[in-house]
Regions:
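Membrane-interface alpha-helices at helix entry/exit sites of multi-pass transporters
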Residues: 105-111
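Hydrophobic alpha-helical transmembrane segments
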Residues: 1-89, 97, 101-103, 115-141
Length: 141
């Protein structure tokens, strides 16, 4: 069984597909991707990231950040949320493989979480660089 065959089997709930059905329609690919996003949105940390994004957008409108600053914020939103989805996927796969304590399982989960943390810290620093001068000007300080 090839990797593609096993992916089709997993996505179809183990029912398998005919050998003649070799090309998955594009909308099915998008549906699976949106299912993954919805799964991720159920995670506590993703909810926190979404709340922070809403706050940044609100402050962005209030403080009238520039187009370039909007672009930076949007790229950072996408990066953090994508990393959070990858982190969720890695955690799910590790949990699928073992529920016992294993050093490699811990390393996989911790490393994925660390990637999200680094991106989040850098996004927060970038946000401070963008928003602090505008907040000071807004309050005439």
């Amino acid at each position: 069984m090839t990797e593609t065959d096993s992916r089709k089997s997993v996505r179809s709930g183990g029912r398998g597909k005919k050998d003649t059905d070799t090309v998955q329609p594009l909308f099915d690919s998008f549906r699976h991707a949106f299912d993954g996003i919805l799964t991720g949105l159920g995670e506590r940390n993703m909810k926190i990231h979404c709340l922070m994004a809403v706050l940044v957008v609100a402050f962005g409108f209030i403080l009238r950040i520039s187009i370039m600053e909007w672009c930076i914020c949007l790229v950072l939103f996408g990066l953090i949320m994508a990393l959070e989805l990858v982190n969720t996927a890695i955690e799910a796969v590790v949990d699928l493989v073992t529920h016992e304590y294993r050093p490699l399982a811990k390393a996989a989960k911790d490393t994925a979480a660390g990637a999200v943390l680094i991106a989040s810290i850098m996004a927060a620093i970038t946000g401070l660089i963008i928003f602090i001068p505008r907040l000071l000007a807004f309050f005439h300080l």
